[in-house]
């Protein structure tokens, strides 16, 4: 299975992050998303040391409130923490809505980068999503879009997007779009997101269930 299953780790303290990371690894995660914005006092945490201590593939994310995150500091502080994480994380995720200069600073420092777009209100048209993805890939290695469907047809737009674009993570959120987190693997998505009971986005399924369902659906080599 080429699609990596990523489990987000969203905790208030560094020890809790380390503990949850261990449980996610034991549960079968291929990669972890460390949500810096979940930390109560991220400025007091040595982000580099935290990621190195975990010793497992990591996506470092410091999600802005505009796109569903919880970071309460300034934008400058948010970017500085991402820059610190970029030195040791396998991937760094930065939002397309960030200032272009900040995106270029972060992606330029990262080993590999994800430029992401989140829309919790609706699913833009396929044409609009294609423009978003191509813009994201001009600056990052992987584009990520996560959008909210109003009907089943909206969920199909997300899968259709994956037929046009490689190096793209595309997610239809919520209960309606839950199946796309599994189906995306059939369309070549490099990463899909699962949880350990407490998801960080609507529609995330348990990591074990996600792996089994992808295994059942993927054709034999």
Curated annotation (Swiss-Prot):
- Short name of one Pfam family for this protein? DHquinase_I
Q: Which keywords does this chain's UniProt record carry?
A: Amino-acid biosynthesis, Aromatic amino acid biosynthesis, Lyase, Schiff base
| Superkingdom as given in the UniProt entry | Archaea
Residues annotated for 3-dehydroquinate binding in this entry: 33-35, 63, 181, 200, 204
One GO BP on record is: aromatic amino acid family biosynthetic process
* PANTHER family, alphabetized: 3-DEHYDROQUINATE DEHYDRATASE
Give the matching NCBIfam families. Answer: aroD
Q: What does this protein do?
A: Involved in the third step of the chorismate pathway, which leads to the biosynthesis of aromatic amino acids. Catalyzes the cis-dehydration of 3-dehydroquinate (DHQ) and introduces the first double bond of the aromatic ring to yield 3-dehydroshikimate.
Membership in a protein family: Belongs to the type-I 3-dehydroquinase family.
Its protein name is 3-dehydroquinate dehydratase
State the organism named in the record.
Methanothermobacter thermautotrophicus (strain ATCC 29096 / DSM 1053 / JCM 10044 / NBRC 100330 / Delta H) (Methanobacterium thermoautotrophicum)
Quote the gene name from the UniProt entry: aroD
């Amino acid at each position: 299975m080429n699609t990596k299953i990523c489990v987000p780790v969203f905790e208030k303290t560094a020890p809790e992050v380390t503990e949850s990371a261990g449980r996610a690894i034991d549960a079968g995660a291929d990669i972890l998303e460390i949500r810096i914005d979940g930390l109560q006092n991220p400025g007091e945490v040595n982000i580099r040391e935290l990621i190195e201590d975990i010793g497992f593939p990591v996506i470092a994310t410091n999600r802005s409130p505009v796109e569903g995150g919880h970071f309460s500091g300034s934008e400058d502080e948010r970017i500085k923490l991402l820059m610190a994480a970029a030195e040791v994380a396998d991937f760094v995720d930065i939002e397309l809505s960030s200032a272009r200069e900040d995106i270029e600073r972060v992606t330029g420092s990262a080993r590999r980068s994800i430029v992401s777009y989140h829309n919790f209100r609706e699913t833009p048209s396929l044409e609009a999503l294609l423009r978003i993805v191509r813009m994201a890939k001009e600056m990052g290695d992987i584009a990520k879009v996560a959008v909210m469907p109003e009907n089943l047809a909206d969920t199909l737009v997300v899968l259709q997007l994956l037929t046009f674009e490689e190096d793209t993570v595309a997610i239809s959120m919520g209960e309606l779009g839950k199946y796309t987190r599994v189906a995306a693997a059939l369309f070549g998505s490099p990463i899909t997101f699962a949880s350990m009971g407490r998801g960080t986005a609507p529609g995330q399924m348990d990591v074990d269930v996600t792996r089994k369902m992808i295994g059942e659906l993927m054709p034999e080599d």
